[in-house]
């Protein structure tokens, strides 16, 4: 995971948005809509939620086995840090995929995903249905 774009300088509320793959277009669309309301956005790209989870679990295990040493912080926690800023993760997958990093995200964490099956339509219509389009984000 990496910071794709930092929040613009200024006052007002801020939110952290995490996207991955093709859904990043929807995240960028949401940024424009949020800016119209005076909300600044940091944009992160998650290249692999599975790898982030494995790394987080490895840090947790190391900390458990070495209680007298300085604790290791998982990459997600290092990158997102501040619990004051809400985080929204958006995925074309089931919500369970980005939810794999929940335990290392401090503060309010919302996951938007495509839970469900048996749907057939255009990508735009499906993203609207599952509420993962730019407007819903």
Each model region followed by its residue ranges:
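Thiamine diphosphate
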Residues: 1-136
């Amino acid at each position: 995971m990496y910071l794709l774009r930092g929040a613009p300088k200024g006052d007002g509320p801020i939110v952290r948005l995490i996207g991955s793959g093709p859904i990043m277009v929807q995240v960028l669309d949401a940024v424009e809509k949020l800016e119209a309301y005076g909300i600044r956005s940091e944009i992160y790209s998650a290249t692999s939620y599975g790898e982030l989870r494995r790394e987080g679990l490895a840090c947790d295990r190391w900390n458990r086995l070495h209680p007298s040493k300085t604790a290791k912080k998982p990459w997600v926690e290092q990158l997102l840090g501040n619990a004051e800023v809400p985080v929204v993760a958006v995925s074309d997958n089931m919500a369970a995929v980005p939810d794999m990093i929940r335990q290392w995200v401090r503060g309010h964490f919302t996951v938007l995903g495509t839970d469900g099956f048996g749907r057939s339509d255009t990508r735009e219509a499906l993203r609207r249905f599952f509420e993962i389009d730019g407007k819903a984000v």
